[in-house]
């Protein structure tokens, strides 16, 4: 019957269907793959054909037929579906399978105002011919189906109204490289462009969404994370709101420190009126966050930070839950509770926590971050001052409420502010850490703005990227990769534009980077070690020692070449203090691996030449970009050997790397009996990482009596994380049984890990 069907071609011409042509394309897409049935894909497709069907719909039907066959027994369908999609995208972009040459493509795209004019200004035609020779378009065939769909949905330049695609992946990679090294000397820039292109197009380095989606376009804002602090006055609150709108519209995820805002009922202007409290202003922030999508790529998102001793804490902890009414809930942001040693001590000793409005207790709020001894002294003093409004609550009640809300929403995060400042890249006396970002991996100094043009405020930005651990042949590879990644991200800081002066001043003075990892689960599987039993501890120590060492060394080399960052004196590195000096020594009880690299030589070099960047490392979530690299997410264990990830492009099946060879080596999330092994590994990483880690906790209620997670277990894991020096905790994942109908190795995963915000890669 199909032989008599007519089809409408892309050019509008109608002709008889050519099944031989379809089979030729299917044969091409299946070449070299195992366990593929071309006839099965053809059969599944043809039953959906109809008269006058468009050839574009035929192509999409074939792609879906192949993608639906991705399974445990036939994982190679992910590559067949990917190749068919690449073919389809190239036809949409170029009208043919073979891409044009780079120079003609760039000229055309600049004419269409899709690419930045500087590409033609900075590079003569001869350079484009050289860059064109670097491009390996066949690398498009290394993408998995999930990767190609993410490219299509988020990263390739397109008209989001008409769905017109304008480029292919290799053009994206070469032009990102060209943009980043455009100001390098003529004699070296082609070398760096080629090396960086090779590293990103072969998935050795993973780039964040703002860079992948925007770098090469006229829009120049590529920092993934923005940290904004609000003061306790209307001018500052409104300046914060303005800053949020500007950055959300430009692809950034937001961290908002609202901890200074005074409590409900506090006096204003010596009692002229009473304060409305935090919630109305949180709603104000929420409206700003949701006012824009992030450059058409994803919706805005933010995390708000406040201390556990805030007078309104009981109302703030429940803002995200589904109970209550609209007036007393602010559900469309996430929240992070700030803790320190004194608060944990009150819990352990069965004592009370006293709640204050920050406006009533001079210097308490600032000392909470920059001086723990002073904080404890002032806190006890104010507890005994009968003239100050306060409320005493049992520490066990407050921690239980916090952990209950963390469990029910999954999105109440933890920041240990003392660890953030004692094990910091920054000197807390000069540049204290008072908040984190959307996903809790960034710890940078901030200062509230009084208006959006305030030169004295500080909005902190962090530019992210990640090393693909699965691509390493050995730890020596990290030297070259670190050099490339530090140079590239440092160039981003000079290349991008800054909508707010205080952000520009901070970014160019501190030059902070956050370089993390992807594919850690594959790295463990490849090395035959596991999350849960301690077998990965020493490997993790050696790996993250090498990562931080080589990143610092690369930044020091760049400082010799271009100068140290202007505010290098604000860092502990300036004093010769390294992460290996300030980590929580309890880590030594779980890992006795010695240091293997010459840290004393590095210390001398840093003291002599400085660093180009105030910070180098942060371990972020990477749900989307890890799919591009066909890698596992960040440091997380996979939920299944084949995960079905819900995204706006539909259900995407992603297979773990080297499934056939290593399927018995992977330790899946819900097969890990408890959080202890994971928290130990995270603490070993934190020993070296100079910012923080988006570390999660995970619970399967079926492992506990009556299918209920005991509060004692939740608190125990929280205390373990603190004892081992973790600065932050991100999501709490609770197994809900939604995936029980799948086979053991196929798990659903909502693509929510930092899905709306850009603080992931």
UniProtKB/Swiss-Prot annotation:
Binding site for GDP: 209, 437, 441, 623-625
Known function: Provides the precursors necessary for DNA synthesis. Catalyzes the biosynthesis of deoxyribonucleotides from the corresponding ribonucleotides.
Subunit structure, as described in the record: Tetramer of two alpha and two beta subunits.
Activity regulation, per record: Under complex allosteric control mediated by deoxynucleoside triphosphates and ATP binding to separate specificity and activation sites on the alpha subunit. The type of nucleotide bound at the specificity site determines substrate preference. It seems probable that ATP makes the enzyme reduce CDP and UDP, dGTP favors ADP reduction and dTTP favors GDP reduction. Stimulated by ATP and inhibited by dATP binding to the activity site.
This protein's record includes keyword Phosphoprotein: no
Alphabetized Gene3D superfamilies for the sequence: 1.10.1650.20, 3.20.70.20
Domain ATP-cone as annotated: residue spans: 5-95
Site (Important for hydrogen atom transfer): residue numbering on this chain: 225, 462
Catalytic activity: a 2'-deoxyribonucleoside 5'-diphosphate + [thioredoxin]-disulfide + H2O = a ribonucleoside 5'-diphosphate + [thioredoxin]-dithiol
Binding positions for ATP per the UniProt entry: 9, 15-21, 55, 91
The protein's Enzyme Commission number: 1.17.4.1
Protein name stated in the entry: Ribonucleoside-diphosphate reductase subunit alpha
GO biological process: deoxyribonucleotide biosynthetic process
Active site, per annotation: 437, 439, 441
Site note Interacts with thioredoxin/glutaredoxin, residues: 754, 759
A GO term, aspect molecular function: ribonucleoside-diphosphate reductase activity, thioredoxin disulfide as acceptor
Cysteine-cysteine disulfides: 225-462
Gene symbol of the encoding locus: nrdA
Alphabetized NCBIfam families for the sequence: NrdE_NrdA (TIGR02506), PRK09103.1 (NF006578)
InterPro entries according to UniProt: ATP-cone_dom (IPR005144), NrdE_NrdA_C (IPR013346), RNR_lg_C (IPR000788), RNR_lsu_N (IPR013509), RNR_R1-su_N (IPR008926), Rrm1 (IPR039718)
Organism annotation: Buchnera aphidicola subsp. Baizongia pistaciae (strain Bp)
